[in-house]
Amino acid sequence: NWTEIRSDPVPLRWVSRITASRYDLGTVYMTQTGRRDDDFQVYIWKSTDFGDTWTDISANIPVGPVNVIREDPVNRNILYVGTDVGVYVSKDGGENYEVLGDLPYAYVHDLQIHPAENMIIIATHGRGMWVLDANDVNDKDKRRRRWY
């Protein structure tokens, strides 16, 4: 039987993405958007107990809808988040985020990391698809030059 997962502090908002951890059984990430209710708060959650409890890991991402979250396939502490204004990366499991690359202002609808090539691939609404070498995540100069 299906069981509804409802727990504080998670609001009743549209769930934009659920991503299971590749590293830890029971860990799952969820993004939500309140766009349909004129709510532009940032909603990024992490559960380490199969969804019984949730922790807010939205940290310092600017206000606006969040559409997707993914774990890095090589480094368990790196998270990638696609928002209505671009891509953010956390290198500390969601405690802090920074803008990833020098993308044009774009709604990032989806984000994947190619496991063999270690390339970040994003799909935008109205700006096409973009690719970045995930190995460049720790090099700010390369991040600014390598989206193509």
Regions from the language model: what does each represent?
Residues N1-W147:
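Beta-propeller blade termini and top-face loops
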